[in-house]
Amino acid sequence: MSSTVWILISILLATVGAVVGFFVRKSIAEAKINGAANEAKRILDEANREAEALKKEALLEAKDEIHTLRTEAELEIRDRRSELQKQENRLMQKEENLDRKDETLDKRELQLEKKEDSLVARQQQIEELESKVGELVQKQQTELERISNLTREQAKAIILGKVESEVSHEIAVMVKESEVRAKEEADKKAKEILSLAMQRCAADHVAETTVSVVNLPNDEMKGRIIGREGRNIRTLETLTGIDLIIDDTPEAVILSGFDPIRRETARIALDKLVQDGRIHPARIEEMVEKSRREVDEYIREVGEQTTFEVGVHGLHPDLIKILGRLKYRTSYGQNVLKHSMEVAYLTGLMAAELGEDEKLARRAGLLHDIGKAIDHEVEGSHVEIGVELATKYKEHPVVINSIASHHGDTEPTSIIAVLVAAADALSAARPGARSETLENYIRRLEKLEEISESYEGVEKSFAIQAGREVRILVKPDTIDDLEAHRLARDIRKRIENELDYPGHIKVTVIRETRAVEYAK
Protein backbone atom coordinates (compact mmCIF):
# COMPACT_ATOMS: atom_id res chain seq x y z
CA MET A 1 0.00 0.00 0.00
CA SER A 2 2.73 2.35 0.77
CA SER A 3 4.31 1.75 -2.65
CA THR A 4 1.04 2.56 -4.37
CA VAL A 5 0.76 5.79 -2.46
CA TRP A 6 4.26 6.70 -3.39
CA ILE A 7 3.53 6.03 -7.02
CA LEU A 8 0.43 8.19 -6.95
CA ILE A 9 2.27 10.94 -5.15
CA SER A 10 5.02 10.75 -7.76
CA ILE A 11 2.50 10.97 -10.59
CA LEU A 12 0.77 13.88 -8.92
CA LEU A 13 4.04 15.70 -8.38
CA ALA A 14 5.04 15.08 -11.99
CA THR A 15 1.72 16.41 -13.21
CA VAL A 16 2.00 19.49 -11.01
CA GLY A 17 5.58 20.01 -12.22
CA ALA A 18 4.48 19.73 -15.83
CA VAL A 19 1.68 22.24 -15.35
CA VAL A 20 3.99 24.63 -13.53
CA GLY A 21 6.64 24.19 -16.23
CA PHE A 22 4.07 24.88 -18.96
CA PHE A 23 3.00 28.13 -17.42
CA VAL A 24 6.58 29.15 -16.71
CA ARG A 25 7.55 28.46 -20.33
CA LYS A 26 4.50 30.30 -21.59
CA SER A 27 5.37 33.35 -19.55
CA ILE A 28 8.96 33.23 -20.78
CA ALA A 29 7.78 32.88 -24.39
CA GLU A 30 5.40 35.81 -24.04
CA ALA A 31 8.20 37.87 -22.57
CA LYS A 32 10.46 36.99 -25.54
CA ILE A 33 7.69 37.78 -28.02
CA ASN A 34 7.14 41.17 -26.43
CA GLY A 35 10.90 41.85 -26.51
CA ALA A 36 11.15 40.80 -30.17
CA ALA A 37 8.23 43.02 -31.08
CA ASN A 38 9.84 45.94 -29.34
CA GLU A 39 13.16 45.22 -31.11
CA ALA A 40 11.43 44.93 -34.44
CA LYS A 41 9.70 48.24 -33.88
CA ARG A 42 13.00 49.82 -32.94
CA ILE A 43 14.72 48.39 -36.07
CA LEU A 44 11.84 49.54 -38.24
CA ASP A 45 12.07 53.03 -36.83
CA GLU A 46 15.82 53.13 -37.48
CA ALA A 47 15.28 51.81 -41.02
CA ASN A 48 12.69 54.49 -41.66
CA ARG A 49 15.08 57.14 -40.42
CA GLU A 50 17.94 55.78 -42.63
CA ALA A 51 15.63 55.52 -45.63
CA GLU A 52 14.58 59.10 -45.15
CA ALA A 53 18.24 60.14 -44.96
CA LEU A 54 19.12 58.15 -48.13
CA LYS A 55 16.15 59.64 -49.91
CA LYS A 56 17.29 63.14 -49.08
CA GLU A 57 20.86 62.29 -50.15
CA ALA A 58 19.66 60.75 -53.44
CA LEU A 59 17.57 63.80 -54.15
CA LEU A 60 20.58 66.02 -53.59
CA GLU A 61 22.78 63.88 -55.87
CA ALA A 62 20.09 63.83 -58.54
CA LYS A 63 19.84 67.60 -58.41
CA ASP A 64 23.64 67.89 -58.75
CA GLU A 65 23.65 65.45 -61.72
CA ILE A 66 20.84 67.33 -63.39
CA HIS A 67 22.74 70.59 -62.94
CA THR A 68 25.93 69.03 -64.35
CA LEU A 69 24.12 67.56 -67.38
CA ARG A 70 22.36 70.85 -68.01
CA THR A 71 25.71 72.68 -67.92
CA GLU A 72 27.38 70.18 -70.31
CA ALA A 73 24.41 70.31 -72.68
CA GLU A 74 24.56 74.09 -72.76
CA LEU A 75 28.31 73.97 -73.51
CA GLU A 76 27.80 71.40 -76.29
CA ILE A 77 24.99 73.43 -77.81
CA ARG A 78 27.20 76.52 -77.68
CA ASP A 79 30.08 74.61 -79.41
CA ARG A 80 27.79 73.24 -82.09
CA ARG A 81 26.42 76.65 -82.78
CA SER A 82 29.96 77.96 -83.10
CA GLU A 83 30.92 75.12 -85.51
CA LEU A 84 27.79 75.66 -87.57
CA GLN A 85 28.63 79.33 -87.79
CA LYS A 86 32.13 78.51 -89.00
CA GLN A 87 30.80 76.08 -91.61
CA GLU A 88 28.34 78.67 -92.77
CA ASN A 89 31.18 81.18 -93.13
CA ARG A 90 33.26 78.68 -95.12
CA LEU A 91 30.34 77.89 -97.42
CA MET A 92 29.80 81.55 -98.05
CA GLN A 93 33.51 81.98 -98.85
CA LYS A 94 33.42 79.00 -101.26
CA GLU A 95 30.36 80.43 -102.92
CA GLU A 96 32.18 83.72 -103.41
CA ASN A 97 35.19 81.85 -104.87
CA LEU A 98 32.94 79.94 -107.25
CA ASP A 99 31.37 83.17 -108.37
CA ARG A 100 34.81 84.65 -109.07
CA LYS A 101 35.87 81.50 -110.99
CA ASP A 102 32.68 81.62 -112.99
CA GLU A 103 33.48 85.17 -113.99
CA THR A 104 37.05 84.13 -114.91
CA LEU A 105 35.77 81.23 -117.05
CA ASP A 106 33.40 83.54 -118.84
CA LYS A 107 36.29 85.88 -119.62
CA ARG A 108 38.44 82.98 -120.88
CA GLU A 109 35.62 81.68 -123.01
CA LEU A 110 35.37 85.07 -124.66
CA GLN A 111 39.15 85.13 -125.20
CA LEU A 112 39.07 81.62 -126.74
CA GLU A 113 36.28 82.60 -129.07
CA LYS A 114 38.34 85.59 -130.20
CA LYS A 115 41.43 83.37 -130.69
CA GLU A 116 39.37 80.81 -132.62
CA ASP A 117 38.13 83.52 -134.93
CA SER A 118 41.72 84.71 -135.35
CA LEU A 119 42.95 81.16 -136.10
CA VAL A 120 40.22 80.59 -138.65
CA ALA A 121 41.23 83.78 -140.39
CA ARG A 122 44.90 82.79 -140.25
CA GLN A 123 44.12 79.30 -141.62
CA GLN A 124 42.37 80.85 -144.55
CA GLN A 125 45.44 83.02 -145.17
CA ILE A 126 47.72 79.95 -144.95
CA GLU A 127 45.55 77.99 -147.37
CA GLU A 128 45.69 80.88 -149.80
CA LEU A 129 49.49 81.06 -149.40
CA GLU A 130 49.80 77.28 -149.87
CA SER A 131 47.79 77.49 -153.02
CA LYS A 132 50.04 80.27 -154.33
CA VAL A 133 53.20 78.36 -153.26
CA GLY A 134 51.90 75.21 -154.98
CA GLU A 135 51.40 77.15 -158.18
CA LEU A 136 54.90 78.65 -157.88
CA VAL A 137 56.44 75.21 -157.20
CA GLN A 138 54.66 73.74 -160.19
CA LYS A 139 55.93 76.60 -162.35
CA GLN A 140 59.48 76.12 -160.98
CA GLN A 141 59.34 72.35 -161.61
CA THR A 142 58.15 72.93 -165.15
CA GLU A 143 60.94 75.47 -165.68
CA LEU A 144 63.56 73.10 -164.18
CA GLU A 145 62.38 70.23 -166.37
CA ARG A 146 62.63 72.52 -169.42
CA ILE A 147 66.15 73.72 -168.49
CA SER A 148 67.60 70.29 -167.42
CA ASN A 149 65.78 68.22 -170.03
CA LEU A 150 64.82 65.78 -167.20
CA THR A 151 61.40 64.78 -165.98
CA ARG A 152 60.56 64.82 -162.29
CA GLU A 153 60.82 61.01 -162.04
CA GLN A 154 64.23 61.01 -163.77
CA ALA A 155 65.61 63.66 -161.42
CA LYS A 156 64.18 61.78 -158.43
CA ALA A 157 65.87 58.56 -159.58
CA ILE A 158 69.25 60.32 -159.95
CA ILE A 159 69.02 61.89 -156.48
CA LEU A 160 67.90 58.63 -154.88
CA GLY A 161 70.78 56.79 -156.57
CA LYS A 162 73.32 59.23 -155.13
CA VAL A 163 71.73 59.04 -151.68
CA GLU A 164 71.68 55.25 -151.82
CA SER A 165 75.36 55.15 -152.79
CA GLU A 166 76.36 57.47 -149.94
CA VAL A 167 74.13 55.69 -147.40
CA SER A 168 75.33 52.21 -148.42
CA HIS A 169 78.93 53.32 -147.91
CA GLU A 170 78.08 54.76 -144.48
CA ILE A 171 76.17 51.57 -143.57
CA ALA A 172 79.13 49.42 -144.60
CA VAL A 173 81.43 51.55 -142.43
CA MET A 174 79.04 51.30 -139.47
CA VAL A 175 78.69 47.53 -139.93
CA LYS A 176 82.46 47.18 -140.05
CA GLU A 177 82.89 49.23 -136.86
CA SER A 178 80.13 47.25 -135.10
CA GLU A 179 81.70 43.96 -136.16
CA VAL A 180 85.10 45.08 -134.90
CA ARG A 181 83.69 46.16 -131.52
CA ALA A 182 81.58 43.02 -131.14
CA LYS A 183 84.51 40.81 -132.15
CA GLU A 184 86.86 42.55 -129.70
CA GLU A 185 84.40 42.17 -126.81
CA ALA A 186 83.52 38.58 -127.72
CA ASP A 187 87.19 37.63 -128.16
CA LYS A 188 88.07 39.18 -124.81
CA LYS A 189 85.30 37.34 -122.96
CA ALA A 190 85.96 34.07 -124.79
CA LYS A 191 89.70 34.28 -124.04
CA GLU A 192 88.96 34.83 -120.35
CA ILE A 193 86.65 31.80 -120.19
CA LEU A 194 88.94 29.58 -122.28
CA SER A 195 92.05 30.57 -120.34
CA LEU A 196 90.33 29.77 -117.04
CA ALA A 197 89.12 26.44 -118.41
CA MET A 198 92.52 25.49 -119.85
CA GLN A 199 94.38 26.45 -116.68
CA ARG A 200 92.13 24.13 -114.66
CA CYS A 201 92.32 21.21 -117.11
CA ALA A 202 95.52 19.19 -117.50
CA ALA A 203 95.42 16.62 -120.34
CA ASP A 204 97.83 14.01 -121.65
CA HIS A 205 99.42 13.97 -125.10
CA VAL A 206 98.27 10.63 -126.52
CA ALA A 207 99.55 8.83 -129.60
CA GLU A 208 98.29 5.41 -130.70
CA THR A 209 99.55 3.02 -133.38
CA THR A 210 98.00 0.13 -135.28
CA VAL A 211 100.45 -2.54 -134.09
CA SER A 212 101.12 -4.36 -130.82
CA VAL A 213 104.23 -6.29 -129.81
CA VAL A 214 104.29 -9.51 -127.75
CA ASN A 215 107.64 -10.36 -126.17
CA LEU A 216 108.78 -13.99 -126.31
CA PRO A 217 111.07 -15.82 -123.88
CA ASN A 218 113.17 -17.08 -126.83
CA ASP A 219 113.10 -17.37 -130.61
CA GLU A 220 112.16 -21.06 -130.46
CA MET A 221 108.68 -19.96 -129.36
CA LYS A 222 108.14 -18.46 -132.85
CA GLY A 223 108.09 -21.94 -134.38
CA ARG A 224 105.59 -23.18 -131.82
CA ILE A 225 103.37 -20.19 -132.53
CA ILE A 226 103.46 -20.95 -136.27
CA GLY A 227 102.75 -24.63 -135.63
CA ARG A 228 102.87 -27.57 -138.00
CA GLU A 229 102.20 -26.32 -141.52
CA GLY A 230 101.13 -22.96 -139.99
CA ARG A 231 97.99 -24.34 -138.34
CA ASN A 232 98.45 -22.41 -135.06
CA ILE A 233 99.07 -19.01 -136.65
CA ARG A 234 96.18 -19.48 -139.11
CA THR A 235 93.84 -20.43 -136.25
CA LEU A 236 94.86 -17.37 -134.21
CA GLU A 237 94.49 -15.01 -137.19
CA THR A 238 91.11 -16.50 -138.13
CA LEU A 239 89.68 -16.24 -134.61
CA THR A 240 90.93 -12.70 -133.91
CA GLY A 241 91.03 -11.12 -137.39
CA ILE A 242 94.56 -9.84 -136.65
CA ASP A 243 97.70 -10.40 -138.73
CA LEU A 244 100.69 -11.94 -136.92
CA ILE A 245 104.01 -10.74 -138.28
CA ILE A 246 106.86 -13.10 -137.38
CA ASP A 247 110.15 -11.82 -138.78
CA ASP A 248 113.77 -11.48 -137.74
CA THR A 249 112.91 -9.26 -134.77
CA PRO A 250 114.54 -11.06 -131.84
CA GLU A 251 112.20 -12.50 -129.20
CA ALA A 252 109.13 -10.58 -130.42
CA VAL A 253 105.98 -11.09 -132.47
CA ILE A 254 104.14 -8.14 -134.03
CA LEU A 255 100.33 -8.03 -134.13
CA SER A 256 98.92 -5.78 -136.86
CA GLY A 257 95.29 -4.71 -137.27
CA PHE A 258 93.08 -1.62 -137.44
CA ASP A 259 90.58 -2.83 -134.82
CA PRO A 260 92.23 -2.07 -131.44
CA ILE A 261 89.81 -4.30 -129.49
CA ARG A 262 90.57 -7.33 -131.65
CA ARG A 263 94.28 -6.52 -131.50
CA GLU A 264 94.14 -6.32 -127.69
CA THR A 265 92.21 -9.62 -127.56
CA ALA A 266 94.88 -11.29 -129.74
CA ARG A 267 97.70 -9.81 -127.64
CA ILE A 268 96.23 -11.11 -124.35
CA ALA A 269 95.49 -14.54 -125.87
CA LEU A 270 98.99 -14.88 -127.35
CA ASP A 271 100.58 -13.72 -124.11
CA LYS A 272 98.61 -16.39 -122.19
CA LEU A 273 99.57 -19.08 -124.72
CA VAL A 274 103.25 -18.17 -124.46
CA GLN A 275 103.12 -18.31 -120.65
CA ASP A 276 101.16 -21.59 -120.67
CA GLY A 277 103.38 -23.25 -123.29
CA ARG A 278 100.60 -25.43 -124.71
CA ILE A 279 99.95 -24.03 -128.18
CA HIS A 280 97.55 -25.91 -130.44
CA PRO A 281 94.27 -24.98 -132.22
CA ALA A 282 91.92 -26.13 -129.43
CA ARG A 283 93.94 -24.31 -126.77
CA ILE A 284 94.16 -21.23 -128.98
CA GLU A 285 90.37 -21.16 -129.37
CA GLU A 286 89.92 -21.48 -125.60
CA MET A 287 92.40 -18.70 -124.82
CA VAL A 288 90.92 -16.36 -127.45
CA GLU A 289 87.42 -16.79 -125.97
CA LYS A 290 88.75 -16.23 -122.44
CA SER A 291 90.68 -13.14 -123.57
CA ARG A 292 87.56 -11.78 -125.31
CA ARG A 293 85.61 -12.03 -122.04
CA GLU A 294 88.45 -10.33 -120.15
CA VAL A 295 88.55 -7.48 -122.67
CA ASP A 296 84.76 -7.04 -122.43
CA GLU A 297 84.98 -6.89 -118.63
CA TYR A 298 87.90 -4.47 -118.82
CA ILE A 299 85.93 -2.25 -121.23
CA ARG A 300 83.01 -2.15 -118.77
CA GLU A 301 85.38 -1.25 -115.89
CA VAL A 302 86.99 1.48 -118.00
CA GLY A 303 83.55 2.94 -118.76
CA GLU A 304 82.56 2.95 -115.08
CA GLN A 305 85.91 4.46 -114.03
CA THR A 306 85.55 7.16 -116.70
CA THR A 307 82.07 8.19 -115.53
CA PHE A 308 83.36 8.28 -111.94
CA GLU A 309 86.36 10.47 -112.82
CA VAL A 310 84.32 12.89 -114.91
CA GLY A 311 81.46 13.02 -112.40
CA VAL A 312 78.71 11.82 -114.72
CA HIS A 313 76.20 9.47 -113.12
CA GLY A 314 73.04 7.64 -114.14
CA LEU A 315 74.21 6.38 -117.56
CA HIS A 316 72.59 3.23 -118.93
CA PRO A 317 74.84 0.14 -118.36
CA ASP A 318 74.98 -0.56 -122.12
CA LEU A 319 76.00 3.05 -122.76
CA ILE A 320 78.76 2.74 -120.13
CA LYS A 321 80.10 -0.34 -121.94
CA ILE A 322 80.01 1.47 -125.30
CA LEU A 323 81.82 4.41 -123.68
CA GLY A 324 84.59 2.05 -122.49
CA ARG A 325 85.15 0.91 -126.10
CA LEU A 326 86.37 4.43 -126.91
CA LYS A 327 89.62 3.57 -125.09
CA TYR A 328 90.53 1.49 -128.12
CA ARG A 329 89.53 4.11 -130.73
CA THR A 330 91.75 6.88 -132.07
CA SER A 331 91.20 9.94 -134.25
CA TYR A 332 94.26 11.40 -135.97
CA GLY A 333 96.32 9.51 -133.39
CA GLN A 334 94.38 10.98 -130.43
CA ASN A 335 92.71 8.52 -128.05
CA VAL A 336 88.96 9.18 -128.33
CA LEU A 337 88.18 8.31 -124.69
CA LYS A 338 90.86 10.71 -123.41
CA HIS A 339 89.59 13.30 -125.88
CA SER A 340 85.98 12.83 -124.65
CA MET A 341 87.07 13.22 -121.02
CA GLU A 342 89.01 16.36 -121.90
CA VAL A 343 85.98 17.79 -123.73
CA ALA A 344 83.79 16.94 -120.72
CA TYR A 345 86.15 18.78 -118.33
CA LEU A 346 86.45 21.84 -120.59
CA THR A 347 82.70 22.01 -121.25
CA GLY A 348 81.91 21.74 -117.54
CA LEU A 349 84.41 24.46 -116.61
CA MET A 350 83.15 26.87 -119.28
CA ALA A 351 79.52 26.14 -118.36
CA ALA A 352 80.29 26.93 -114.71
CA GLU A 353 81.84 30.26 -115.75
CA LEU A 354 78.68 31.12 -117.73
CA GLY A 355 76.26 29.99 -114.99
CA GLU A 356 74.97 26.95 -116.93
CA ASP A 357 74.32 23.41 -115.63
CA GLU A 358 77.84 22.04 -115.10
CA LYS A 359 76.77 18.39 -114.65
CA LEU A 360 74.66 18.39 -117.81
CA ALA A 361 77.51 20.09 -119.70
CA ARG A 362 79.98 17.39 -118.62
CA ARG A 363 77.51 14.69 -119.64
CA ALA A 364 77.11 16.22 -123.10
CA GLY A 365 80.89 16.63 -123.49
CA LEU A 366 81.60 13.04 -122.45
CA LEU A 367 79.05 11.55 -124.88
CA HIS A 368 79.65 13.84 -127.88
CA ASP A 369 81.80 11.22 -129.73
CA ILE A 370 80.02 8.09 -128.42
CA GLY A 371 79.18 7.11 -132.01
CA LYS A 372 82.88 6.52 -132.78
CA ALA A 373 82.80 3.42 -130.55
CA ILE A 374 80.75 1.47 -133.11
CA ASP A 375 80.97 3.54 -136.32
CA HIS A 376 83.07 0.77 -137.93
CA GLU A 377 80.30 -1.75 -137.18
CA VAL A 378 77.16 0.30 -138.00
CA GLU A 379 76.31 2.32 -141.11
CA GLY A 380 76.35 6.09 -140.83
CA SER A 381 78.61 8.85 -139.50
CA HIS A 382 79.65 8.87 -135.87
CA VAL A 383 77.33 11.87 -135.33
CA GLU A 384 74.27 10.00 -136.65
CA ILE A 385 75.16 6.86 -134.66
CA GLY A 386 75.73 8.93 -131.51
CA VAL A 387 72.32 10.61 -131.85
CA GLU A 388 70.66 7.21 -132.31
CA LEU A 389 72.40 5.80 -129.22
CA ALA A 390 71.55 8.82 -127.06
CA THR A 391 67.92 8.71 -128.20
CA LYS A 392 67.71 4.95 -127.64
CA TYR A 393 68.95 5.25 -124.06
CA LYS A 394 66.72 8.30 -123.36
CA GLU A 395 69.41 10.91 -122.80
CA HIS A 396 68.58 14.58 -122.13
CA PRO A 397 67.51 16.59 -125.25
CA VAL A 398 70.45 18.98 -124.66
CA VAL A 399 72.87 16.01 -124.80
CA ILE A 400 71.28 14.74 -128.03
CA ASN A 401 71.48 18.19 -129.65
CA SER A 402 75.11 18.59 -128.50
CA ILE A 403 76.03 15.30 -130.22
CA ALA A 404 74.14 16.28 -133.39
CA SER A 405 75.57 19.81 -133.65
CA HIS A 406 79.20 19.51 -132.49
CA HIS A 407 80.40 19.25 -136.13
CA GLY A 408 77.90 21.80 -137.47
CA ASP A 409 75.54 19.23 -139.03
CA THR A 410 72.57 20.83 -137.23
CA GLU A 411 71.99 24.12 -135.42
CA PRO A 412 72.76 24.14 -131.67
CA THR A 413 69.68 24.85 -129.55
CA SER A 414 71.44 25.56 -126.25
CA ILE A 415 74.54 27.25 -124.87
CA ILE A 416 75.84 23.85 -123.70
CA ALA A 417 75.77 22.54 -127.30
CA VAL A 418 77.89 25.52 -128.40
CA LEU A 419 80.32 24.92 -125.52
CA VAL A 420 80.67 21.24 -126.50
CA ALA A 421 81.61 22.23 -130.06
CA ALA A 422 84.12 24.79 -128.73
CA ALA A 423 85.66 22.30 -126.28
CA ASP A 424 85.86 19.66 -129.03
CA ALA A 425 87.74 22.05 -131.30
CA LEU A 426 89.97 23.19 -128.44
CA SER A 427 90.89 19.63 -127.44
CA ALA A 428 91.59 18.63 -131.03
CA ALA A 429 93.58 21.74 -131.92
CA ARG A 430 95.98 21.90 -128.97
CA PRO A 431 99.62 21.11 -129.85
CA GLY A 432 100.42 17.40 -129.81
CA ALA A 433 96.82 16.28 -129.54
CA ARG A 434 96.46 14.93 -133.07
CA SER A 435 98.63 13.93 -135.97
CA GLU A 436 98.02 13.44 -139.68
CA THR A 437 99.90 11.91 -142.57
CA LEU A 438 102.34 14.02 -144.59
CA GLU A 439 100.30 13.48 -147.75
CA ASN A 440 97.08 14.80 -146.16
CA TYR A 441 99.00 17.71 -144.64
CA ILE A 442 100.48 18.82 -147.98
CA ARG A 443 97.14 18.34 -149.76
CA ARG A 444 95.41 20.53 -147.18
CA LEU A 445 97.98 23.33 -147.57
CA GLU A 446 97.68 23.23 -151.37
CA LYS A 447 93.88 23.32 -151.16
CA LEU A 448 94.03 26.34 -148.82
CA GLU A 449 96.15 28.31 -151.29
CA GLU A 450 94.02 27.14 -154.24
CA ILE A 451 90.79 28.38 -152.61
CA SER A 452 92.38 31.71 -151.69
CA GLU A 453 93.81 32.39 -155.17
CA SER A 454 90.55 31.52 -156.96
CA TYR A 455 89.08 34.97 -156.21
CA GLU A 456 89.55 37.96 -158.49
CA GLY A 457 91.94 40.59 -157.16
CA VAL A 458 94.07 38.11 -155.15
CA GLU A 459 97.75 38.49 -156.00
CA LYS A 460 99.27 35.69 -153.88
CA SER A 461 98.41 33.51 -150.87
CA PHE A 462 100.54 31.66 -148.31
CA ALA A 463 99.47 28.85 -145.94
CA ILE A 464 101.55 29.24 -142.77
CA GLN A 465 101.74 27.90 -139.19
CA ALA A 466 101.21 24.29 -140.29
CA GLY A 467 97.99 25.19 -142.08
CA ARG A 468 96.49 27.04 -139.12
CA GLU A 469 96.55 30.38 -140.99
CA VAL A 470 96.35 31.53 -144.59
CA ARG A 471 97.57 35.01 -145.57
CA ILE A 472 96.20 36.54 -148.77
CA LEU A 473 97.85 39.48 -150.57
CA VAL A 474 95.36 41.45 -152.70
CA LYS A 475 95.76 44.13 -155.37
CA PRO A 476 95.01 47.51 -153.73
CA ASP A 477 93.69 49.07 -156.95
CA THR A 478 91.13 46.26 -157.38
CA ILE A 479 89.97 45.60 -153.81
CA ASP A 480 89.27 48.36 -151.26
CA ASP A 481 89.17 48.00 -147.46
CA LEU A 482 85.49 47.06 -147.28
CA GLU A 483 85.86 44.54 -150.09
CA ALA A 484 88.81 43.00 -148.19
CA HIS A 485 86.49 42.17 -145.27
CA ARG A 486 83.94 40.61 -147.63
CA LEU A 487 86.71 38.57 -149.29
CA ALA A 488 87.90 37.24 -145.92
CA ARG A 489 84.34 36.14 -145.04
CA ASP A 490 83.82 34.46 -148.43
CA ILE A 491 87.12 32.54 -148.21
CA ARG A 492 86.33 31.50 -144.64
CA LYS A 493 82.95 30.08 -145.74
CA ARG A 494 84.52 28.12 -148.62
CA ILE A 495 87.19 26.66 -146.34
CA GLU A 496 84.50 25.55 -143.86
CA ASN A 497 82.43 23.94 -146.64
CA GLU A 498 85.21 22.28 -148.67
CA LEU A 499 87.98 21.31 -146.21
CA ASP A 500 88.12 18.82 -143.34
CA TYR A 501 90.58 19.98 -140.68
CA PRO A 502 91.06 19.85 -136.90
CA GLY A 503 90.77 23.06 -134.89
CA HIS A 504 90.36 26.36 -136.76
CA ILE A 505 92.06 28.23 -139.61
CA LYS A 506 92.75 31.97 -139.47
CA VAL A 507 92.09 33.88 -142.72
CA THR A 508 94.08 37.14 -143.06
CA VAL A 509 93.61 39.46 -146.05
CA ILE A 510 96.45 41.98 -146.51
CA ARG A 511 95.95 45.10 -148.66
CA GLU A 512 99.02 47.28 -149.06
CA THR A 513 99.15 50.63 -150.85
CA ARG A 514 102.56 52.13 -151.68
CA ALA A 515 103.27 55.65 -152.89
CA VAL A 516 106.76 56.04 -154.43
CA GLU A 517 108.40 59.24 -155.62
CA TYR A 518 112.01 59.87 -156.64
CA ALA A 519 113.81 63.08 -155.69
CA LYS A 520 116.23 64.31 -158.38
Swiss-Prot record:
Residues 210-273 form the KH domain. It holds the Pfam family HD. CDD domains: HDc, KH-I_RNaseY. Residues 336-429 form the HD domain. InterPro entries: HD/PDEase_dom, HD_domain, HDIG_dom, KH_dom, KH_dom_type_1, KH_dom_type_1_sf, Ribonuclease_Y, RNase_Y_N. Endoribonuclease that initiates mRNA decay. The chain crosses the membrane at residues 4-24. The keyword Iron-sulfur does not apply. SMART domains: HDc, KH. It comes from Bacillus anthracis. It is a single-pass membrane protein. The keyword Transmembrane applies. One of its GO terms (molecular function) is RNA endonuclease activity. One of its GO terms (biological process) is mRNA catabolic process. NCBIfam families: HDIG (TIGR00277), RNase_Y (TIGR03319). Its EC number is 3.1.-.-. It comes from the Bacteria. This is Ribonuclease Y. Belongs to the RNase Y family. Keywords: Cell membrane, Endonuclease, Hydrolase, Membrane, Nuclease, RNA-binding, Transmembrane, Transmembrane helix.
